[in-house]
Amino acid sequence: FLSAITSLLGKLL
Protein backbone atom coordinates (compact mmCIF):
# COMPACT_ATOMS: atom_id res chain seq x y z
CA PHE A 1 0.00 0.00 0.00
CA LEU A 2 2.72 2.45 0.99
CA SER A 3 4.61 1.64 -2.20
CA ALA A 4 1.59 2.74 -4.24
CA ILE A 5 1.44 6.06 -2.40
CA THR A 6 5.15 6.69 -2.82
CA SER A 7 4.97 5.86 -6.51
CA LEU A 8 2.07 8.27 -6.98
CA LEU A 9 3.93 11.01 -5.10
CA GLY A 10 6.98 10.45 -7.26
CA LYS A 11 4.89 10.77 -10.41
CA LEU A 12 3.28 13.99 -9.15
CA LEU A 13 6.62 15.41 -8.13
Curated annotation (Swiss-Prot):
GO terms for cellular component: extracellular region. GO terms for biological process: defense response to bacterium; defense response to fungus; killing of cells of another organism. Expressed by the skin glands. It comes from the Eukaryota. Its main location: secreted. The modification Leucine amide is found at L13. It is found in: Secreted. Belongs to the frog skin active peptide (FSAP) family. Temporin subfamily. Antibacterial peptide with activity against Gram-positive bacteria (MIC=6 uM against S.aureus). May also show activity against Gram-negative bacteria and fungi. Shows hemolytic activity on human erythrocytes (HC(50)=60 uM). This is Temporin-1SPb.
